[in-house]
Amino acid sequence: MDPASGVIVAQTAAGTSVVLGLMRCGRIWLCPVCAATIRHKRAEEITAAVVEWIKRGGTAYLVTFTARHGHTDRLADLMDALQGTRKTPDSPRRPGAYQRLITGGTWAGRRAKDGHRAADREGIRDRIGYVGMIRATEVTVGQINGWHPHIHAIVLVGGRTEGERSAKQIVATFEPTGAALDEWQGHWRSVWTAALRKVNPAFTPDDRHGVDFKRLETERDANDLAEYIAKTQDGKAPALELARADLKTATGGNVAPFELLGRIGDLTGGMTEDDAAGVGSLEWNLSRWHEYERATRGRRAIEWTRYLRQMLGLDGGDTEADDLDLLLAADADGGELRAGVAVTEDGWHAVTRRALDLEATRAAEGKDGNEDPAAVGERVREVLALADAADTVVVLTAGEVAEAYADMLAALAQRREEATARRRREQDDDQDDDADDRQERAARHIARLASGPTSH
């Protein structure tokens, strides 16, 4: 929050309300407020990608990956097994089972000596027309079975591409054969199981539960996906899931991370264990939340494979900076601001201490057709009066509201320019890293040959 100006609670042309002047943490794993907006925007991106792909004639699958787990397993160990370890100054990053899915000669094929892939050496990815995938990681925890991290991925197949890396483009679509799809699904199940077994035999899932495939047949399926991931899971939505892990209520005695946080808040606020939502003692919930914080640090909750966005003609990225961009863009989604009030820093702190911030933003909405600035100001002032802060509200003139909207758009435009430049740098860095990796692999191969037995 800007101490000099406090916040602005404004009504948009669409009748919604926004709060300008607040700092955003952008922590998708840990902040319920930021996560709700980020995941909603991510869900819109995912839906746009799936709809675009199906319109082009491609095919999409929802694939869910799980590992066997028990109450003594650490979340960090399970996340390492699924997603890979995080790079540290002392150790390189180690791939997880997810990364193993799209590596190796069986998957990628073998290149002929002239650098072109020969027809008899194509890999599974060529036969199914693999284009890329979007991965989302979800976590639940229970007192009996412990942590349960799992991955949902939208996999796009049935495409033919040309070019490499940043120049890669989709040039055609086709329907993969049933034999090719069966081969792919069997290969992924085998690779997933073997990769987890290698990390820890206890994580090895059975063939029935480790990897599950669901085909998205039509654009309606994609829209159903959007409907599901944009609202609370209530048992009536389609069995399709990806981005909105923040809204999910776990079942079978398990709880989602934000349910841990909610129970912590209820118990520290004086509610009894019987009355508070969720399970377990305060100590158990605090311990699980702290473990969750440590295990998710530095990881991406939602990630697209490299160059997939550009091949589909979509912008955006997967970093924390991109998440912050989405938060800022969400403020501008409602259109031009038409009414608003300024609230001082002390006034807004009084509102949040009484948990009235949601009521204050609702008071600024104009869905009932009430767009009069004075009326908006009066409704917000009535809410702040409950926190003894009515005198901290100042109704803004039309010119002041327009100036606030212009500042918001200017900040958004600047962030988008910075994001474009940042992604270009990241793309260049990725290509440099690829070249370094190839050199390291070649050096290791030469070293192995040099250290091998000498024939006489």
From Swiss-Prot:
One example of a Gene Ontology biological process annotation: plasmid partitioning
Basic and acidic residues bias (residue ranges): 416-427
Sequence ranges of Acidic residues compositional bias: 428-437
Stretch list, region Disordered: 416-456
Entry's family note: Belongs to the Gram-positive plasmids replication protein type 1 family.
General function of this protein: Essential for the autonomous replication of the plasmid pIJ101.
Annotated protein name in UniProt: Protein rep
